[in-house]
UniProtKB/Swiss-Prot annotation:
Gene of this entry: rpiA
Catalytic activity, EC: 5.3.1.6
The name this protein goes by in its record: Ribose-5-phosphate isomerase A
Assembly, per entry: Homodimer.
Keywords: Isomerase
Residues at which substrate binds: F29, G30, S31, T32, D86, G87, A88, D89, K99, G100, G101, G102, K126
CDD domains documented for this protein: RPI_A
NCBIfam families assigned: PRK00702.1, rpiA
Length: 237
C-alpha cells in the first residue's frame, strides 16, 4: 500500500470508529470512502457492529456494500441518516468542500443534507487555502444546451471541459447527466457562487458542499486530526 493509500485508510478508520450499532449510515463514493465501506463490512462480519443499514451515494458504492454483506436501504425509506462518511477533492479552512471527482455529487449532496453528521475523510494534500485552487469544480448538467452552459461558465472566468470516459465517450452520472469540469481558479466566496450556479437553468447540481461537513478527519505524517466544525470562523491549522 502506498503512503497516500495508507493515509486514506488511517482517516477512514478514525471516522468508522464513530459508528454505533443501530445506525443508518451514508456510504460515500470514491477511493477514500471505499476504505470506510470495507471497514464497515469487516466490523459487521466480526460482530463489532450490528443492526446497521447503509444508504449508498452511488451505484458503485451499492455494489461494493452488497459484496461486503452490508444491508442497504434508500433515502426514501429512512427518516434520517445518522452519519455519512465520504471523501472530498478539496477542503478549505472553513470546511467547505469541492466534491464530485467521481461524478456522484448529486446523490452525495442529497445524502449529506439528510444526515445528522457528515464525516469527511482526507489526506493532507486535499487541504487548500481556497476552493478551486487545486481542483476543478464539477458541474452536473443536462444534455440540452450543455455547450451553452459551458460557454456561460467560461464567461465567468477559467476554462471548462466536458468530462470523458477512458474510451473518449462522455462520462455519464448515475442519473444519466453530463459533467462539466470548470477550472475556475480560487473561489472568493463559495456561497455566492453556489447560489449563482443553483439559479442557472440547465445545471442539475454543482460540487460545492457548504455547511455540510460536521467532522473532518485529516491524515498526515503525524497521524489523524479530528476537526469538528466550529459555529463560525476558520478551522485550526
Amino acid at each position: 500500500m502506498s503512503s497516500v493509500e495508507t493515509l486514506k485508510a488511517m482517516a477512514a478508520a478514525a471516522a468508522v470508529a464513530l459508528i454505533q450499532p443501530g445506525m443508518v449510515i451514508g456510504l460515500g463514493f470514491g477511493s477514500t470512502a471505499a476504505y470506510a465501506t470495507r471497514m464497515i463490512g469487516e466490523r459487521l462480519a466480526n460482530g463489532e457492529l450490528r443492526e446497521i443499514v447503509g444508504v449508498p451515494c452511488a451505484e458503485g458504492t451499492a455494489a461494493l456494500a452488497r459484496e461486503l454483506g452490508i444491508p442497504l436501504t434508500t433515502l426514501d425509506d429512512v427518516e434520517r441518516v445518522d452519519i455519512t462518511i465520504d471523501g472530498a477533492d478539496e477542503v478549505d479552512p472553513y470546511m467547505a468542500l469541492i466534491k464530485g471527482g467521481g461524478g456522484a455529487l448529486l446523490r452525495e449532496k442529497m445524502v449529506a443534507q439528510a444526515s445528522r453528521r457528515v464525516a469527511i475523510i482526507v489526506d493532507e494534500s486535499k487541504l487548500s487555502p481556497a476552493l478551486g485552487t487545486r481542483f476543478a469544480l464539477p458541474i452536473e448538467v443536462v444534455d440540452f444546451g450543455y455547450r451553452a452552459t459551458a460557454r456561460w461558465l467560461a464567461a465567468q472566468g477559467g476554462s471548462v471541459r466536458l468530462r470523458l470516459r477512458s474510451d473518449g465517450q462522455p462520462f455519464r452520472t448515475d442519473q444519466g447527466h453530463l459533467i462539466l469540469d470548470w477550472a475556475c481558479g480560487p473561489i472568493a466566496d463559495p456561497t455566492v457562487l453556489a447560489d449563482r450556479l443553483a439559479a442557472r437553468a440547465g445545471i442539475v447540481e454543482h460540487g460545492l458542499f457548504i455547511g455540510l461537513a460536521t467532522d473532518l478527519f485529516v491524515a498526515g505524517a503525524t497521524g489523524v486530526r479530528h476537526i469538528v466544525r466550529p459555529d463560525c470562523g476558520r478551522i485550526a491549522p
